[in-house]
Amino acid sequence: MRFDPASLIDLDRYPIDRPDSGAFQRLLTSVQKDLDHSGCAVLKKFLNDDGIAAFVAEAENAAPQAYRAFNRTNAYFTKDDATLPTDHPVRQFFDRSNAFIPADNFKQGTALRSIFDFPPFDPFVKAALRQDKFYRYADPLADVIVNMAEAGNGFPWHFDTNNFTVTLAVQNADGGGAFEYVPNIRASGENFAEVQKVLEGRSDKVKTLNLEPGDLQLFLGRNSLHRVAPLSGETPRYVAIFSYVEEPGMVATPERAI
């Protein structure tokens, strides 16, 4: 079945297909204001009910093809540094479980691929993020994927290695899974003391965001510490990830592809 992306997106509320309209400019201004304020913008119910249902069906159908990985990582995705004190944030490692459904499970015409290929989508995201260098990730296994997390899974506190992420909530778990973040905690320096407070559960600067199916999120995660709280229940959490990079033709290195 081939999907028309215009039938999956709430274009009345989010007129990304009408860039010359006043409604589009108001939307763009609102998103950019949120990004400037907290590094996070959410377009609630960007997908309509039909779009959500189509995304869930595709994710469930492809879930058996998910690749799973388990490791321990710190917030910086770096190795341990024995020259630092044992309680230093760089030396705090946490279990990380990750499962993703590769992009080759979402062929042209599927709901997920239709949104990614919708001609107005990329220009809107680029304009919202105000990115001059903005290219689609060229990796055929990772340009648009679905992250899958199950009971006990989550994503510990970390900083992103890229400037921004573009994600779309597809299905929530029965419990847990809140998106927690500290905006711009290291915008002007590493700020290790405050990072340590977050890691130890002592910070009063943590914001909590409960994303719902159909929500599109733009997030500036390089300087904002964030995590996905552990999940519970039988229902898996699905989140679609649209991947963009700063150079054309980029694909994963062998190390990143494992």
Model segments located where?
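Conserved "cap/hinge" positions at secondary-structure junctions
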Residues: 45, 221-222
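Short beta-strand His + acidic residue motifs that chelate non-heme Fe in jelly-roll/DSBH
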Residues: 155, 225-232
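A short hydrophobic beta-strand segment most commonly corresponding to one strand
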Residues: 165-168, 218, 234-249
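Catalytic core of non-heme Fe(II) oxygenases with the double-stranded beta-helix
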Residues: 107-113, 122-216
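Signature of the catalytic double-stranded beta-helix
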Residues: 47-48, 58, 62, 66, ...
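Fe(II)/2-oxoglutarate
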Residues: 1-37
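Short conserved micro-motifs at the rims of enzyme active sites and ligand-binding pockets
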Residues: 192, 229-231, 251-255
